[in-house]
A protein has these predicted regions:
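Acidic, metal-coordinating catalytic segment for phosphate/diphosphate chemistry
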Residues: 1-18, 24
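Nudix hydrolase/Nudix homology domain
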Residues: 37-39, 111-164
Length: 164
């Protein structure tokens, strides 16, 4: 018997990537999508054609608000288990650093997907963002120099976390 092709056997895990974009005053860029409730970060689905999380972050940010992200540091990875109302998958969050006011004043929204944007303080952003995104942003802000791994939005402790 001939085994099935690898692509038919291996699981497919949906993935997306988002960007933390700040202004020089420490305010976070949030977007109001037209296709779902609540506010979100620039970002979206990673294409199945071999696109990397970083490439998706850059592409989606350019598509949604016409910002060209040049640098980014991975700050959070969240594994979401499938649920009845959600397929699950991997979520990557990149801190793309501060943008100057000139770049942010020239934001052009993709009107079919994004109705408005705001630059808000972290606390206000955490209040406006949906639960899963809020938990990723909170984890990234709490550990500004590290990489946080979450499962279903919750921190996972491992043996290395107990080091002194």
């Amino acid at each position: 018997m001939v085994p099935p092709p690898t692509e038919e056997v291996l699981p497919r895990i949906p993935a997306s990537a988002s960007a933390l974009i700040w202004d020089r005053r420490g305010r976070l860029l949030i977007l109001n999508p037209t296709y779902k409730g609540g506010w979100a970060l620039p970002g979206g689905v990673i294409e199945a054609d071999g696109e990397t999380p970083w490439e998706a972050c850059r592409r989606e940010t350019r598509e949604e608000c016409d910002l060209d992200v040049q640098r980014g540091r991975l700050v959070c990875v969240d594994f979401l288990r499938p649920r009845p109302n959600r397929p699950g998958g991997m979520r990557f969050l990149f801190d793309c650093g501060p943008f100057d006011g000139d770049a942010l004043s020239r934001i052009v929204l993709q009107e079919e997907e994004i109705s408005q944007f705001r630059l808000v303080g972290v606390e206000k952003a955490l209040h406006k963002l949906s639960g899963p995104i809020r938990r990723r942003v909170a984890a990234a802000v709490q550990h500004p120099r590290g990489l946080t791994y979450l499962e279903d939005g919750q921190p996972v402790r491992g043996p290395m976390d107990d080091r002194s």
